[in-house]
């Protein structure tokens, strides 16, 4: 299981800033809330749908109607919340941390001072998948291969870039660094267009299930001194193992590292909206967990 202690340091950083959000005045005009998620086949979209289903059950009481929006992922969601165009959104805990600190993808635009953590949802192991015929034994074997690094704006892409920097690699170290979205990398792998992909996701995931079932794709471990240093240095990372036999043709456990999926909002999001969403999830937590196996 994924140890949450290192990653929860991230949430503490943001949650410590969150009390202002709860003190914000309620807005009677706020009747619709939109949650930014990810691709339609991803866990964020399913988890967002689960949240909205629970919120909408009680809409007669609180007057708030919830809907999900498919987006480019974590970085996109944070930037769109900052722009006032989303009420809430999913974000990897590393993206959330970097946004608050003004690091990495947020260095040019500056810290997102109004970003607030609402709650954490599920662990997201970084999952590396290889084409069966590519003869990949470890991540370093992808050098000179065709590899999907994730679409710009996604948390997967942000985490991939941090790993490559730590390894001293550049995108040019791959024969091809494709930028496919999560629902595209599985078919591309099975069609022989890429040799592997990197994906931060809660498990089980349809985007991993499909290529392991359809073309015998293999999960590749992410371990070694570089990963050890990343986990030691970054408060939002923790080591995790993808269980043995979770996916077809992968009977062994796959050690890796990962983050937490979190729901974030702006300090400007009305407090009654945050309360209604949080109450809907935690008053119906057993039902929430049943709405997707990754929860």
Predicted regions: what they are:
Residues 108-121, 126, 246-255:
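A structural signal for short loop-to-beta-strand junctions that line the ligand-binding cleft
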Residues 32-58, 64, 124-191, 286:
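Bilobed "Venus flytrap"/periplasmic-binding protein-like clamshell domains
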Residues 11-21:
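Bacterial N-terminal signal peptides
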Residues 22-28:
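Sec/Tat signal peptide C-region and signal peptidase I cleavage site
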Residues 1-13:
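Bacterial N-terminal signal peptides that target proteins for export
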Residues 252-295:
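Segments of small-molecule ligand-sensing domains
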Residues 28-99, 107-108:
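N-terminal (or domain-start) structured segment
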Residues 93, 104-105, 134, 171-270:
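Pocket-lining segment of extracytoplasmic ligand-binding domains
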């Amino acid at each position: 299981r994924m140890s949450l202690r290192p990653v929860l340091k991230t949430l503490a950083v943001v949650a410590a800033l969150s009390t202002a959000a709860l003190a914000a005045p309620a807005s009677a005009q706020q009747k619709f809330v939109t949650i930014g998620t990810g691709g339609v086949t991803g866990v964020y979209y399913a988890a967002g749908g689960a949240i909205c289903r629970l919120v909408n059950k009680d809409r007669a009481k609180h007057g708030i109607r919830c809907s999900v929006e498919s987006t480019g992922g974590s970085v996109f969601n944070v930037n769109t919340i900052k722009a006032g165009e989303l009420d809430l959104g999913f974000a990897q805990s590393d993206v959330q941390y970097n946004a608050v600190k003004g690091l990495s993808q947020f260095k040019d635009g500056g810290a997102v001072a109004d970003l607030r953590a609402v709650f954490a949802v599920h662990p997201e192991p970084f999952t590396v998948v290889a084409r069966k015929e590519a003869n990949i034994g470890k991540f370093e074997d992808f050098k000179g291969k065709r590899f999907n690094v994730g679409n710009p704006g996604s948390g997967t892409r942000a985490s991939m870039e941090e790993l490559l920097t730590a390894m001293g690699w550049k995108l040019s170290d791959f024969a091809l660094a494709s930028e496919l979205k999560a629902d595209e990398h599985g078919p591309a792998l099975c069609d022989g267009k890429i040799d592997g992909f990197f994906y931060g996701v809660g498990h089980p995931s349809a985007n991993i299930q499909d290529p392991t079932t359809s073309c015998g794709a293999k999960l590749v471990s992410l371990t070694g001194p570089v990963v050890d240093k990343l986990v030691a240095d970054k408060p939002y990372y923790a080591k995790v193992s993808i269980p043995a036999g979770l996916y077809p043709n992968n009977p062994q456990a796959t050690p890796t590292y990962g983050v937490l999926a979190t729901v974030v909002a702006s300090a400007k999001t009305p407090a009654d909206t945050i309360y209604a969403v949080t109450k809907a999830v935690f008053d119906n937590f057993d039902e929430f967990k049943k709405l997707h196996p990754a929860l």
